[in-house]
Amino acid sequence: LEVYNLSGNSMELEIFPIFAFNINKSNHYTMKKTITLGLAALIGVLTSCGGPTATEPKLHVIFDNPAPRTMPLSLFGEVPSDLVASLDIANGIPSSVSVMLLEKDGQQLLFDGGNGNEDSRLLPCLQVLGFAPSDIDAIFITHLHGDHIGGLVKDNQPVFPQAKLYIPSVELDAWTQAPNVQTLVTAYGENVVKFAIGDALPCGVEAMAAYGHSPGHTIYRTDDKLIVGDIMHALALQMEHPDFCARFDMDHEKAIASRKAVLEQVKKE
């Protein structure tokens, strides 16, 4: 089982890396790195080891920010100095905003929508992959923080006009008074689909509750991959030490429990 974090930070300062982590039966964490060359290495494509076929799903990792970013260590509270030194994170922790594009069963599915900043790379990268905004069939929302939905609306209009927008009902109910969420829901109108955990979703995508970072934070499984939103903000720290929370986690106790549950699930598989 492979896990993809939409706050795609890494354990090394490299330009536009893609990291997935596996956990083997002995609790040993290994990092697998894929770096694509071409078009500024902004897009990563992950497929099975046997080589892609015309019908084989493809998962593209798109880095929304055009340059590497670093989060200050202070966002994670009091981290012991010896741990900081051993992890070499005294100068901050690498971070990025990422969007996943899944090509499966003849459909194009996005997971979250990036931050929508002027320098966003989402639309240019989709264009390079051969897709216009109108080609996106569905968008699955992990949670409704601005850096995950900001790229879905522009000038009060949907950026992806043909897409169904799948939002976990627990998450949407928690943010009904937020102006940016109201704008999002109004823009997509009848294309907004509220769903509960356990509901059937397109292309066999499975939603799983991972509450804590936000009230209804949701992760998604597609085949042997997990797309886990903001379950972790700092892989370098939180993979081995999941009790550390970023300031962004709204309910620290639940966020820790969700992190540990995901890590345990991957370890079992």
Residue ranges and their predicted role:
Residues 49-105:
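Zn-dependent metallo-beta-lactamase
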Residues 161-209, 214-269:
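Metallo-beta-lactamase
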